[in-house]
Amino acid sequence: MELCGNVMTNSKYEMFRLKCLYCSIESELKDWELFIVHVKSAHYCEDEDVRINEIKEDTEELYSVVDAADPAIAYGPDEFFEVIENSNGVDQWMEADSKDIQYEEDATAWSAATNNSWEFGPGGSSLELPAGKEVTQMDESSQNHIPLNTDDDDVDCSDFFMSEDDLAPPRKPGRPPRRTRPGQVFKFKVSFIRSNPRVLHLIQAYKEHPCLWNPSDEHYQDEPARSMAYEAIMERMDRKANVLFTVEELKKTLEQLHVQYTLALETKQRGKLVGLAARYFAKCEFLSVAPVVTPRENEEDNDLTAIKLNFKEENLITTSFIETYANYPVLYNQALPDFGSIEIRADAFKRMAKEFQPVVKANETDVYIAVNKLRRWLYDAIRRLKSKELIQKCSKQEVQYLQMCSFLPAKGSESQVLYCDYCDKRFHGDYNLRVHIVKAHEVGDLPYLCSFCPRRFDRHVDMDRHKLRSHFERKLKCQYCEKSFAVDTDLKVHTLIHTGERPHVCDICGKTFRLKLLLDHHVNGVHLNIRPYSCNMCTKTFRKKFELANHIKGHLNIRDKKCEYCDATFYDHSSLSRHRRSHRSE
């Protein structure tokens, strides 16, 4: 079977349409036969047989390498034994044997092109088209992005790294041009239990640069040599596997490769490493001399987190929080009539914070953040408990906390989907809906409340930056002056003043700026004359929101900026700065 389209639906699951994966054609569900005719005629793929031969050669080469490397390993058929939880909470078992070669295709690039007014149906259902005896399959779970479980991709390539021109037969007369897979991918998951030619390319490219993994290599500590090695791997992955890495994303992917090797080594030592995982492990045998990289622990709490949950060992905070959360079924039980009421849910978070105060002093935002962390840990732990893939297993204490969380619904049960009372749009999570209501309908307050002051924010990251800047010690010191900062990006921007770097250049006039934001303001205001902020009291318009706010202060005669040298007052900071210069000149 070959995936050729997606089934799209609206938010109420009342209307369904078919959308072609390779173009913008859509059709009604009842016209599926005409849709298949369109795919066969407009998007004939003539290199299908070539791809199957490449995959067979790739599989044979995998077997030969492993047999030569470790004859003690017993190899059975490929076992894609990962348990994947789909959106309906159903376990999907992916299997393949030596007779039915399978490979996965990434739907990320195709799905991104769908119309915003439509969504994938439940479970991300897709239409399948018969394509001969051989089988291809798209792993829909590859679109889920979680730590060590990022997008899973595939590409037209073999382990022999031959180009398409070397393998493709002459074009058949009378056939339309073959379809091409649109767009590049920017990341993919490294897994030893899924067949993915991109992983093979990565292993081969990484093996050719021992300065990145062999401590005894003479260039192991040579940063220029390591940078050149990263660039070479990025170039090769772009050319051979259609993956456009950044340096940071490449480093994360290589870390995944090391983690998979470490977990496979532990499994081999227990005598349980078989099938596809054993063959990938054999291809990575060169990593035996590399420093051991272990899986990262679950997300760590920092100083900004008020409720510090720890599932690795028994503790009062985690136990009390789970017990308190269980007392508020309106936050997790979809069967209750008040489950969808954003006002009642917000009040429940406040009451939960008040009830939890004898253990930890926290506000409703701290409770909401802790609830989200609990749910993320819960569903990840369930996956690790049920799965046979190469990931870290649950500890005994985690299993005990899992039993305490048995009151929570299964993942994918629409338990966190909430609807806006004003426009019927749906959102995942209370705070996403509350931000929408404030911005789109101008009702209520922004959800993220600072733990130390009354300020509110629309994003978690903005609240954390505010806490660091306003309520924590500034530990980052400038190497050129005595100033210190609480946020790393603030220090980097400040350092540009000392170094004189202005990396952002206007393409129209050549003027340079330290910040991308300043460049955008320059282009929009000077060259495009975009002035989106207009005064309600006069006809003036402004480029920036704060300029409008200062202008309105002038209308209202609000002069809150006062000179420290005299009694002069002003309604904006720029006027005060000009006035200060007059004092300095005197």
From Swiss-Prot:
Q: Which UniProt keywords apply?
A: Chromatin regulator, Chromosome, DNA-binding, Metal-binding, Nucleus, Repeat, Zinc, Zinc-finger
Asked if the record carries the keyword Transport, the reply is: no
Q: One GO MF term, please?
A: chromatin insulator sequence binding
SMART domains, alphabetized: MADF (SM00595), ZnF_C2H2 (SM00355)
- For whether the record's keyword set contains Cytoplasm, the answer is no
Q: Which domain of life is it from?
A: Eukaryota
Q: Where does it reside?
A: Nucleus; Chromosome; Nucleus, Nucleoplasm
**A cellular-component GO term for this protein:** nucleoplasm
Question: Where would you say this protein principally sits, based on its record?
Answer: nucleus
GO:BP terms for this protein?
A: chromatin organization; positive regulation of transcription by RNA polymerase II
Q: What is known of its domains?
A: Possesses 2 MADF domains, the negatively charged MADF1 and the positively charged MADF2. Both MADF domains are essential for protein function. MADF2 is important for recruitment to heterochromatin and may mediate interaction with other proteins.
Question: Note on file?
Answer: The overgrowth of red pigmented tissue in the eyes of mutant flies is reminiscent of 'Clifford the Big Red Dog', a character from an American children's book.
- What does the record give as the function of this protein? Chromatin-binding protein involved in the organization of active promoters and insulators. Essential for the activity of heterochromatin promoters; primarily binds to specific motifs within promoters of housekeeping genes. May also associate to a lesser extent with promoters in euchromatin. Mediates recruitment of Cp190, a multifunctional protein involved in the recruitment of transcription complexes, the creation of open chromatin regions and the activity of insulators.
Q: Subunit arrangement?
A: Interacts (via regions flanking MADF domain 1) with Cp190 (via regions between the BTB domain and first zinc finger domain); the interaction is probably direct and is essential for protein function.
Name under which the protein is recorded: Madf and zinc finger protein 1
Annotated source species: Drosophila melanogaster
